């Protein structure tokens, strides 16, 4: 944003101070919103980690960043035979830097051949949602095809264990954001590799916002230094975990690889309540002792997420976790310490996944337009989601569709229109079972189908699906 006139800046600073005073008068802003988050931990299973690191050759991709630097320090404490960081930029601290870019398969192959890793941690990615929207092709090449290059290099080199750091944003069934979409395709490939028989055990973690490496805290600090902090809005929240939780998750995923379902991930149990960015900014401003103004810039592309109610399980049969969706919730499991929670990822048939990746690659080869590359990326995610849902229990699909699209809580037409792609992919996956000759005719299910038909009919472009849902209730009505 352009610099503000001095008078405007002074007015914002005065208004911000008055807002902070008012909130303190209500008993708010008394504690650092991040203090509790920074104290949380995931119990490190040190003995099991040591058995898989001591005396072995370890390679970290993207190890020059915040998480990678802390991870390398921890790995070094377990006395590996060698520690290599494959990254485009040099690092400080432990290990040897191997300059390389995971987008280049030849570079990745050469580095793996030269260093002969036995353990791999794959962290390299375009990790900021806003940046991914600005560098669409680079995000796809890095997060999607770079991950494929790492998987193939692990296979060729006979790596024993490989751990991938995914994102909690992958709990979304579908997305219209480049970052989430690219990471979902990376997850799908990693899980496919985990299911396949081969020399490598593939394991995965899902992170949420890592405090010490986070965009929000950094932008607030930078704004305080200039006297003006920009926020997306007054009522924005985000889940957080700390660097200790993130790195312990990675090491524990290595230690436990092979002890749970291969196509699963680990996350931290204790993520606390989401942090309000306005309260965080006001607390940090007060702590600085400087005159600082606040302004709301609006939610940029990549961060404008809407909550689809069917994303989470409302049955009360499973524990709620913000990084586990309703498809994954029934598969939950925990580690012995109770500080990690895991779940399985929906299976995409390998042929369908490969076909989606091939079509995406073909689209990238024929266009230089970011908007067209993004469209192809989102379509690939839709194809993978549709193929994954095709193998799911119809009753579960109906349950999720009911939670997300039933008239009681579906929201207005505009809200429903936003979720049309998600509703469509679930409805299309469910219909073959509903239209089968032996389809269940329980009154409760039929009532839900009739109600859903009404919801679908209200969404532009879904009239045909609504008609098919309505038709599924007719045999019972006739009886």
Q: Language-model features: where?
A:
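Non-catalytic terminal and boundary segments that flank Rossmann-like NAD(P)-dependent oxidoreductase
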Residues: 1-57, 371-479
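N-terminal Rossmann NAD(P)H-binding glycine-rich loop of SDR-like oxidoreductase domains
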Residues: 50-78
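Rossmann-fold cofactor-recognition segment
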Residues: 93-105
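NAD(P)H-binding glycine-rich loop region in Rossmannoid oxidoreductase-like domains
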Residues: 102-142, 173
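A conserved pocket-lining segment of Rossmann-fold NAD(P)-dependent short-chain dehydrogenase/reductase
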Residues: 132, 219-248, 252-274, 294-306
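Conserved Rossmann-fold NAD(P)-dependent oxidoreductase catalytic core, especially the SDR/UDP-sugar
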Residues: 134-137, 141, 145-187, 202-203
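Active-site Tyr-X1-5-Lys
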Residues: 176-205, 213-225
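Mid/C-terminal beta-alpha module of Rossmann-like enzyme folds, strongest
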Residues: 256-356
